[in-house]
A protein has these predicted regions:
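Conserved, mostly hydrophobic/aromatic
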Residues: 23, 53, 76, 88, ...
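A conserved active-site cap/scaffold subdomain adjacent to cofactor or substrate pockets
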Residues: 96-97, 103-140
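Metal-coordinating catalytic core of metallo-dependent amide/deamination hydrolases
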Residues: 1-91, 97
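Alpha-helical segments flanking ligand/cofactor-binding loops in enzyme cores
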Residues: 37, 41, 74, 99-100, ...
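Glycine-enriched alpha-helix->loop->beta-strand junction motifs that scaffold or abut catalytic
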Residues: 40-49, 81-84, 101-110, 131-136, ...
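Histidine/acidic-residue-rich catalytic or RNA/ligand-binding cores of hydrolases
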Residues: 58-70, 98-103, 120-129, 146-161, ...
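Active-site microenvironment of metallo-dependent hydrolases
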Residues: 180-275
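His/Asp/Glu-enriched, well-ordered alpha-helical/loop segment
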Residues: 78-85, 127-211
Length: 275
C-alpha cells in the first residue's frame, strides 16, 4: 500500500522529470519469494522500474545454491525480476552463461568498483558484460560500504581494475565515461539525459584541468581527468539547468555546518555503541 501511495504521489514518468519511484528491496534475500514475485507484477502494472543488489559475494552465491538449489540470477528469473526494467547492483558472481543471458534479457548492472574492492567482494566482469550487450552504468553503492561516494573515483578505479588480465585496450577512458553517463541513462530508461547535445537535459559536470596535477596531459582532457589527479571535485555541477556546485562548493547549504553535524552524529552513535 505504501508503494502505491508513493507512486501515486511522487512518480513522474515524463521526460526531464526529477522524481521517479523505483521498487527496490535491498537484496532478494531480505524479503520472501512471494513478496518479490508480487513486487514484479505490481511494478509492471504501475510502469515503474525495479532494482536490487545481486551476485555481490561468493557467500551469497553459495547460500542461494544451498538453500534454493539455484543461482541468484536463476532465482530472479523465477520471480519475474529480469528484463529491461530491472537492474542489479554489483553483479560480480555471474557465470559466463549467465552473462550471456543477462544480455539476451536486456537487464542492467550498476557497477560499484570501489565498494566491491573495499569489501573484498570481487571484481565484476565488466568487459564481458559489455561484450554480451548488458547495459552497464557506474555507481557508488552506499555510505555503509563506500566512504567517499565519489563518482569520478569510481571511474578512475574502473578504468584501471578492468585492464588487469584483459589488456589496456579493453577499458579505454571514453568507454568508462560512456558507462558513467549514457550507460546510467540507458539503465534508468531516460534517453533525455547522459549526453551533451541539443534537446537533452542541461546536466553538466565541469572540472578544472589547469592545475599541476594535469601538467603535460592536455593532449586529451578525457584521458587526463581519469589518469591524472586524485578524483578532483567538480568545479561546477549543473542538473537540469540548476547550478548545484559552484566554484567547488555546494550551493544551498553550509558545508561546514553539515561537516560538524555529521561528526556529532557519528560520535553519538559510537558512544551509544560503547566504543
Amino acid at each position: 500500500k505504501d508503494c502505491d501511495r508513493l507512486i501515486a504521489k511522487y512518480h513522474d514518468p515524463d521526460p526531464f522529470a526529477m522524481t521517479r519511484i523505483v521498487l527496490a528491496p535491498c537484496s532478494p534475500f531480505s524479503v520472501t519469494k512471494e513478496s518479490l514475485a508480487e513486487t514484479a507484477v505490481f511494478a509492471r502494472e504501475k510502469k515503474v522500474f525495479m532494482h536490487t543488489h545481486l551476485a555481490e559475494t561468493n557467500d551469497e552465491d553459495d547460500f542461494c545454491r544451498q538453500k534454493l538449489g539455484m543461482s541468484p540470477l536463476e532465482y530472479m528469473e523465477s520471480v519475474g525480476w529480469t528484463g529491461p526494467d530491472v537492474w542489479y547492483a554489483h553483479g560480480i558472481w555471474f557465470t559466463p552463461e549467465e552473462i550471456k543471458r543477462l544480455g539476451d534479457m536486456n537487464c542492467g548492472v550498476a557497477h560499484c568498483p570501489c565498494s566491491n574492492l573495499r569489501l573484498g567482494s570481487g571484481i565484476c566482469h565488466v568487459p564481458a558484460l559489455l561484450e554480451a550487450g548488458v547495459r552497464v552504468g557506474i555507481a557508488v553503492d552506499g555510505s555503509a560500504s563506500n566512504d567517499s561516494s565519489n563518482l569520478l573515483k569510481e571511474m578512475q578505479t574502473a578504468l584501471l581494475v578492468h585492464r588487469v588480465g584483459t589488456g589496456v585496450s579493453s577499458m579505454p577512458p571514453r568507454k568508462v565515461i560512456r558507462m558513467a553517463t549514457r550507460g546510467g541513462a540507458d539503465i534508468l530508461g531516460q534517453p533525455e539525459i547522459g549526453q551533451i547535445q541539443p534537446g537533452m537535459a542541461a546536466d553538466l559536470a565541469l572540472f578544472r584541468l589547469d592545475r599541476i596535477d594535469f601538467a603535460g596531459a592536455m593532449a586529451d582532457p578525457a584521458h587526463a581527468v581519469l589518469f591524472c589527479g586524485s578524483a578532483p571535485r567538480a568545479e561546477y555541477t549543473i542538473v537540469a539547468g540548476r547550478v548545484l556546485v559552484e566554484k567547488g562548493e555546494l550551493t544551498g547549504l553550509d558545508e561546514r555546518e553539515v561537516f560538524h553535524r555529521a561528526n556529532d552524529l557519528a560520535a553519538g552513535l559510537l558512544r551509544r555503541a560503547g566504543k
